[in-house]
Amino acid sequence: MIPCRAVLTFARCLIRRKIVTLDSLEDSKLCRCLTTVDLIALGVGSTLGAGVYVLAGEVAKADSGPSIVVSFLIAALASVMAGLCYAEFGARVPKTGSAYLYTYVTVGELWAFITGWNLILSYVIGTSSVARAWSGTFDELLNKQIGQFFKTYFKMNYTGLAEYPDFFAVCLVLLLAGLLSFGVKESAWVNKFFTAINILVLLFVMVAGFVKGNVANWKISEEFLKNISASAREPPSENGTSIYGAGGFMPYGFTGTLAGAATCFYAFVGFDCIATTGEEVRNPQKAIPIGIVTSLLVCFMAYFGVSAALTLMMPYYLLDEKSPLPVAFEYVRWSPAKYVVSAGSLCALSTSLLGSMFPLPRILFAMARDGLLFRFLARVSKRQSPVAATMTAGVISAVMAFLFDLKALVDMMSIGTLMAYSLVAACVLILRYQPGLCYDQPKYTPEKETLESCTNATLKSESQVTMLQGQGFSLRTLFSPSALPTRQSASLVSFLVGFLAFLILGLSILTTYGVQAIARLEAWSLALLALFLVLCVAVILTIWRQPQNQQKVAFMVPFLPFLPAFSILVNIYLMVQLSADTWIRFSIWMALGFLIYFAYGIRHSLEGNPRDEEDDEDAFSDNINAATEEKSAMQANDHHQRNLSLPFILHEKTSEC
């Protein structure tokens, strides 16, 4: 009996969820000084990195040709789906933590730790790799003199390590960590400055491309490409066409355009850093959704414009994969423009570096404040900055940039990001179908009047909710549910979302590794494909039939459950495409994370060790007021359910920094 009780207690620890209250939402130990413009600049700077100067040429030459503009459109639509899910959670739970926090309040502690631990890896590798890229780009402008010096005197001949230690990258990371520790307001100004320069350079590229471009480069004939291949003595492709495709706007067909879209999807990664600023924004419920959606729109316009200008200036088959824009300007005899491009590239790398470094200490801070990581990381400076987490993040990233060859580790960034996207989309589905009780809004809320009609309707239906929650599960409640969500319908949706993720995983594996069997029309593959598709559609339609919570927040994802479900499909499919070596490295990282969680985090979690407010104030500026000594497990669950459904709206609030 005792072992069973211990196992049950252990299982409850893994699925316990974070309690978020109105009191904890309005208070913050961090400096509330960021505006909507700051968030847009942060999102654009983080997302619109140096990839815009390189990725367009690489994808256009190898996959899409001139139809790269369509590839970016498809990738942008897929990214917007994830962005909208982040935007809703940013409006519901405007606290520091991003996907880690959203997972914690919805599906439990273990998944939250997995999400946060992977985000830490993604941001560390991102910061280190961008720092080395900045160092390498600057070295190129100096004719590689810095690299030659370190190769001569500090060469490292060890497997897995870099060719030489990058002292310049270390200085860059530590300088940025110092800037972030000094204050978020100053960091925001630096980011806006470099982002503005980057945007101006990209506008110059677009205008120059459209002026010097030629529409004929989008209409190259297949015969012309065959002649070029023959003159270069290059063998034709398997289908008899040129190795450069069939010409025209889609030389590699629509499959090539889709392949390019899968690569272009990663160009929109980075907007999630906006979601980590919930406690540093003056009006988070409005600023975070606007910042995410606007930054993605600006980035799409930039990628679309640059790729169009590039393929108009120069035939796609002549594009240089490493430096497409400088080579294209030389092709149209505007050689001096390459210096403008180099300046823009350095500015883009600077904003991308800040965009990778900015959210990392905030994830560490949020996890440490909740007790899942070492609590010294939750210390806040007098300038209201998470100084301990920032300096720790800077040191770790600097060591990575100093010693390691990060090319083999970059794919691991994708796992953390795609997993976070998938979980946030799943959490939106689960949260929107939870039953909710109505609580009085804070009397200082200026937006309260806009929500009163919904609130009154919910109050009138409170007795009906109580009656419905007593019903048991049956097929009738499955296909003909009540008008209001109940605990049974919420549990059903939670199960169906998990089952849908499992089905999508199976479908992705089948279409990735069994595509040849499907092409040969083998019976087993077609049967599995049909089964997965039918079950996915049935699950989504069943979720759609369930009643949603009618309470409103400042932003809500449209087209539920179809949009989040499609976002989960895209993210899981891209995760399946990653190599086995990447998953092995990921397993090692997760083993280290589980060691920390089960040795430290599970015992020090605030949700498992409730304290009163004064204790939390002393414990490294922890401002969570939800946990009180007298709450029982049932009270915590009821409190969690009702708080998640509240339309959290705070007034614009600033603090002295």
Curated annotation (Swiss-Prot):
Stretches assigned to the Extracellular side: 60-63, 126-163, 214-248, 310-339, 407-409, 511-523, 578-581
PTM remark: N-glycosylated.
Gene3D superfamilies (alphabetical): Amino acid/polyamine transporter I
Localization terms from the record: Cell membrane
Name under which the protein is recorded: Cationic amino acid transporter 2
Regions annotated as coiled coil: none
Cited function: Functions as a permease involved in the transport of the cationic amino acids (L-arginine, L-lysine, L-ornithine and L-homoarginine); the affinity for its substrates differs between isoforms created by alternative splicing. May play a role in classical or alternative activation of macrophages via its role in arginine transport.
Membrane topology: Multi-pass membrane protein
UniProt similarity note: Belongs to the amino acid-polyamine-organocation (APC) superfamily. Cationic amino acid transporter (CAT) (TC 2.A.3.3) family.
Protein source organism: Mus musculus
